[in-house]
Amino acid sequence: MMRHVAGADQDTDDERVTAAVAAAQHGDETAFRTVYRTVHPRLLAYVRTLVGDADAEDVASEAWLQITRDLGRFTGDADRFRGWTATIARNRALDHIRKVGRRPLPGGDETVLHGIPDRSDTADEALASLATGRAMALISRLPADQAEAVVLRAVVGLDAKSAAQVLGKRPGAVRTSAHRGLRRLAELLEDDTASDGVTFAGAPTQKDVR
């Protein structure tokens, strides 16, 4: 399970987002701000993976304009909303890439999640470690398909099926890309943090990204 808020806390967060989306669809501005504050940081991290630091804010703003415009037509819970917004953001990012004629390398986002545990004793902690700002800065070293799969699953919080819908791929292909990307990120993080005395109990396995 690739979520950084586990168990009851995750359920509560999902319920809050689901309720806020429903209220925002009826014109509740406070609810919309709740949705934005909850979803935007990780959505922006995904956009950075696609277009790089320089244009990420502009592309994310375009995505939110469409999200706001089409919100009334959305149906579903928090999970579906995350997938829906990620699809919109990806489409806006690909439009931007077509305009500029190239896919820039992403930069790091130090605001998504902070802090690397001194030691990852469980798979969940290992996965959480891979979504720190330091890991985000290393994603530029991954192939594009692996980078997207990792960010959609480990940062945005989508399951394999939802991520596959965003990417237009089979869930199995997304699991494979995420698995390979996480393994490589774990290696890069191990190298990058060795001088700081940070260690990892081990890279995640294929089972961890299902």
How would you describe each model-predicted region?
Residues 82, 96-119, 126, 196-198:
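Short, basic/polar amphipathic helix motif occurring as a linker/hinge flanking DNA-binding modules
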